[in-house]
Structure formats: structure tokens, C-alpha cells
Amino acid sequence: MDCACATGGSCSCAGSCKCENCKCTSCKKSCCSCCPSECEKCGQGCVCKGGSSEKCSCCN
């Protein structure tokens, strides 16, 4: 799964995740997809490639 983000650092994904090219600004938690833009705790401008059940743990 390719997590395309506009700007920022990198997402830290779990070993089983296929997250590539993810450049969330502040989300460093394990995740399979970028945090959606409405997540205030995570980097803005990210595109969520997964379903609602695949949100980054830092969005909870």
C-alpha cells in the first residue's frame, strides 16, 4: 500500500504493513495508512488509503 503524503517526515509502520512513501508530518505511530486530514494530532495533508478501521493509532 502506498501512503502518499504532501509534506513532512515519515510514518513508522508495523513490520507487516506495506506502507511506502508516507510522509506524514507528525504521525510516528505504527499504521498501515496515513492519518486522515481531519486528525488534529497527526500531520495535515495526508491521504488515507485504508478504511476507517485502519486509522493510525495516534488518531484515537
UniProtKB/Swiss-Prot annotation:
Residues noted as binding a divalent metal cation 1 in the record, renumbered to the chain: 3, 5, 19, 22
SUPFAM superfamilies: Metallothionein
Positions with a binding annotation for a divalent metal cation 3: 13, 17, 22, 27
Residues annotated for a divalent metal cation 6 binding in this entry: 35, 39, 42, 59
UniProt-annotated binding residues for a divalent metal cation 5: 32, 34-35, 48
Residues annotated as binding a divalent metal cation 4: 31-32, 42, 46
Region Alpha: start-end pairs: 29-60
Binding positions for a divalent metal cation 2 per the UniProt entry: 5, 11, 13, 24
Record family assignment: Belongs to the metallothionein superfamily. Type 1 family.
Record text about domains: Class I metallothioneins contain 2 metal-binding domains: four divalent ions are chelated within cluster A of the alpha domain and are coordinated via cysteinyl thiolate bridges to 11 cysteine ligands. Cluster B, the corresponding region within the beta domain, can ligate three divalent ions to 9 cysteines.
Function: Metallothioneins have a high content of cysteine residues that bind various heavy metals.
Protein name: Metallothionein
Species name: Ambystoma mexicanum (Axolotl)
